[in-house]
Structures are given as C-alpha cells and as structure tokens.
C-alpha cells in the first residue's frame, strides 16, 4: 500500500456520498507498499480502506480482482470485501483513478515473521489455491517471464549505477529463465504478491489476506516461490531454512506439491526473485515527486536471486523430495 495520488477532503466527501458507510470522521494515507494509493477511512460505521488503482492495474482488470475476493470469501478464505455504492456498483472514480472501498480486516502484518506465521501463510496459500479452482474468470499474468523483458528495458539504464555488473546479471538470468521456464506445471489462481504486509495476523493466528491487484492465472508453485522469497529471509539477508520448512510443510498439508513442482521450485524461486528485482528497480527510477511512498531496495532481491542460483534442489529449502511433511 502507498499514496501516489493526493485526494482533497472535499473530493473525498463528495465521493463518499454515493456509499452507505456512515459519516466520514477522519482519513489518512497509508505509506506502506509500492503500487496503489490507499487511505484508511474512519466513519461513524467503522473503518474502511479506500484504494485508488495506479499504473500497473488496468481498469478492465478490476472485475477479476473484485470478483475473486468475493469468490474466495464464499469458500472460507478470509479476505476483504468491496463495498457497493448506492447504485450497486463496486468501482467508482476519484481524482481520475479507479477507486474501490473495501471493509477493514482486523490484525497486523508481521514485521519479522516467526516460524508459526510462516506455517500459517503456507496453509492459507494452499487454501486459496484450492478455493480458486472453480473461479470462472481468467487473467493471464502480465508480469510472468515474457513480461520481464519489457521491465528489463525500462530498468537497464539504472542497473549498473546501482551496482556494478547488475545489468549483466539481469540479462543473463532473463535469458536463462526464458529458455528454461517450465510449461506443464499445475496452474490456477495465484495471489502473486503475498508478502508479509499483505497478510494480517492476530498473534500467530492468520486473520486475512489482502491486496489482490496482481492476482492472475499462472503456475501455482510460482506463488509458492514468491512466498519463499518474501517470508524466509532474515533482515541480514540470510535464508532461514527453519521458516522455509515450516512454510512448505504448511502448504503441503493443504495441497501437496507434485514431484515436478518440487523439482522446479528452485528455478521458480529464481524467477520470483528476478521479477521483484526488476519491478523494484523500475519503481526506484520512477517515483513521482512528492509521492508518499518509500521505494523498496532492489538489491535485496539481487541477493536473493544469487542465493537461489546456488540451490540444487528443494532439499536446500529444508525439506525432502520424498515428502514435504515431516
């Protein structure tokens, strides 16, 4: 979450007249995250999140995201639900951006996930993948391997000034992944951005998954690989095998990874690291002046990419290929 687009109080008040969510008491921007503009609204009826969709989110994709949240919730996945306006619509326009109001989920995201929370997010991800099996809409992943070349072109000029040799690393890895990317693994609905700041907990109990603007149809194990990157490294950049084992075992309890998925996981983890390295690099080069946003460090994912390049098999993530559950 972040704030790229400023919203005047009068404009917000007029926008909210179309919704039956009570009288606006206060609102504030949410600086965390990197993609869309978000505000926390406090009204006489409770708390809500207002999201203005920016850059990478196309208006025509919103029905997919919003319908998916309703679908997942109907199957027991805890996630936000959009508020309809008085005309029965869930998407409006505010400050020239598509805008949606969703209900507020209780909980906080873990700044430093513990082992129990890693296991919990593994279980929740498997549950989401299973719940999405009969979701009727389809959205291809615009940020999968073929889309990374366009990101590379945008980011290449800023690579070596950030770290000598980074441009060559990116190009070589792109070339390798483009040729080696698996084509016959199980696919379905994936979150594609399930970082700790998109998962809420109350204590160690997971209370909800949020932020679905990157959700799409792609390789299910790629979603697992994204989480390995996001949840299983420490602040000193070391890989935490205990957390990885807990996460993978948690996932496997709900949806056991097939042998081919296990074999492909190191490659998928490289791809996930490269994807976020590229988007972070692009974002760091294109922060709007005055935006209330903290660009995230691209080099964090360069380090993760190099780690995954050294991985030989899923055993290096702390589990045996004969069975993920200990």
From Swiss-Prot:
Pathway(s) it belongs to: Amino-acid biosynthesis; L-threonine biosynthesis; L-threonine from L-aspartate: step 4/5
Origin superkingdom: Bacteria
Secretion signal span: none
Keyword Cytoplasm set for record: no
Enzyme Commission designation: 2.7.1.39
Keywords from the UniProt entry: Amino-acid biosynthesis, ATP-binding, Kinase, Nucleotide-binding, Threonine biosynthesis, Transferase
Disulfide bonds: none
Statement: the UniProt record of this protein carries the keyword Transcription regulation: no
GO biological process terms, semicolon-separated: threonine biosynthetic process
InterPro entries assigned to the protein according to its UniProt record, in alphabetical order: Aminoglycoside_PTrfase, Homoserine_kinase_II, Kinase-like_dom_sf, Pseudomonas-type_ThrB
GO molecular function: ATP binding; homoserine kinase activity
Catalytic activity: L-homoserine + ATP = O-phospho-L-homoserine + ADP + H(+)
Enzyme class at the top of the EC tree: transferase
Pfam family, one: APH
Record CDD domains: HomoserineK_II
Family label: Belongs to the pseudomonas-type ThrB family.
Name listed for the protein in its UniProt record: Homoserine kinase
Species of origin: Rhodopseudomonas palustris (strain BisA53)
Gene encoding the protein: thrB
């Amino acid at each position: 979450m972040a704030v790229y687009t400023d919203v005047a109080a009068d404009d917000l008040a007029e926008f909210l007249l179309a919704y039956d969510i009570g009288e606006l008491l206060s609102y504030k921007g949410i600086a965390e995250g990197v993609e869309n503009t978000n505000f926390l609204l406090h009204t006489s009826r409770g708390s809500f999140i207002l999201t203005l969709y920016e850059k990478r989110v196309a208006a025509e994709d919103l029905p997919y995201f919003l319908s998916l949240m309703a679908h997942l919730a109907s199957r027991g996945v805890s996630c936000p639900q959009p508020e309809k306006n008085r005309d029965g619509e869930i998407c409006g326009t505010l400050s020239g951006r598509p805008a949606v109001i969703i209900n507020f989920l209780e909980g906080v995201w873990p700044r430093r996930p513990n082992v129990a929370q890693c296991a919990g997010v593994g279980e929740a991800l498997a549950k989401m993948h299973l719940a999405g099996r009969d979701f009727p809409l389809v959205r291809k992943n615009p940020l999968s391997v073929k889309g990374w070349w366009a990101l590379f072109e945008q980011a290449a000029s800023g690579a070596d000034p950030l770290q000598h040799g980074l441009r060559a690393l990116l190009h070589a890895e792109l070339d390798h992944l483009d040729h080696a990317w698996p084509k016959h693994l199980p696919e379905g609905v994936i979150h594609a951005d399930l970082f700790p700041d998109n998962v809420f907990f109350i204590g160690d109990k997971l209370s909800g998954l949020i932020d679905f603007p990157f959700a799409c149809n792609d390789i299910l194990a790629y979603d697992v690989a994204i989480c390995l990157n996001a949840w299983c490294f420490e602040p000193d950049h070391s890989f935490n095998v205990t957390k990885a084992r807990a996460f993978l075992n948690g996932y496997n309890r709900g949806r056991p990874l097939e042998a081919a998925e296990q074999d492909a996981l190191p490659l998928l983890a490289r791809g996930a690291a490269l994807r976020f390295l590229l988007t972070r690099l692009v974002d760091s080069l294109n922060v709007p002046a005055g935006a209330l946003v903290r660009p995230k460090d691209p080099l964090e994912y360069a380090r993760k990419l190099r780690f995954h390049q050294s991985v030989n098999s899923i055993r290096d993530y702390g589990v045996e290929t004969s069975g993920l559950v200990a």
